[in-house]
Amino acid sequence: MGTPYMDKYLKEAIAEYEQKIETGEDFYMDASTLMDIEEYYEKSNRKYDAERLMRFAEKLHPDNEEVLVVKAYQLKGDGKWNEAMGIIKGIANQANRDVQLFYIEWDVACSRLDKAEVRTQHNLPAVMNDNDYDWYLDLGEIYLDYGFQKRALKYLEQIPKNYQFRSRADELIAEA
């Protein structure tokens, strides 16, 4: 969403989605676009709109991995860990990064840090490239969310200065 093209694309997709929902017209929209709109609604504190969109996305794409992951994270956010875990366990591609991060977060939330660490090491690539540092950023956020500052710093401080989201990493380091 950082590029002008994406901003324009997202605005157009939101306008189309909202217009079609408002008129009750049947329409198709791919799952990835719907999840971009859902993320926008969440970041804009439009919870009702995000939930309504998820109901639509689930009907349109009931087996889509991305839709299922977002649904699970919504449930987790509402404190419905068991229901969320059921969805995550039902996703065919258990190697999915977001699925693995969910399991790691579950272990951290339950203070099973050694288990989370084993899962983390199993999933991190042997050689890190630019996009792989997203793992470190996500892990840092997870550990901070549950009060494990030293574990968070272990990952956040390994993120290179030229990483595209380094400013977010610096914010998290300051928070720790």
What are these regions (language model features)?
Residues 18, 22, 55, 89, ...:
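Alpha-solenoid helical repeat scaffolds
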Residues 32, 65-66, 98-100, 132-134, ...:
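Start-of-helix register in tetratricopeptide repeats
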Residues 36-37, 71, 103-105, 138-139, ...:
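Structural register within alpha-helical repeat arrays
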Residues 39-40, 74, 106-109, 142, ...:
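Residue-level signature for tetratricopeptide repeat
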Residues 44, 78, 110-112, 146:
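Structural motif corresponding to the intra-repeat A-B loop/turn of tetratricopeptide repeats
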Residues 47, 81, 113-115, 149:
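TPR-repeat structural position
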Residues 50, 84, 116-118, 152:
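Single-residue signature of alpha-solenoid repeat helices
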Residues 62, 95-96, 128-130, 163-164:
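Short coil turns that delineate tetratricopeptide repeat
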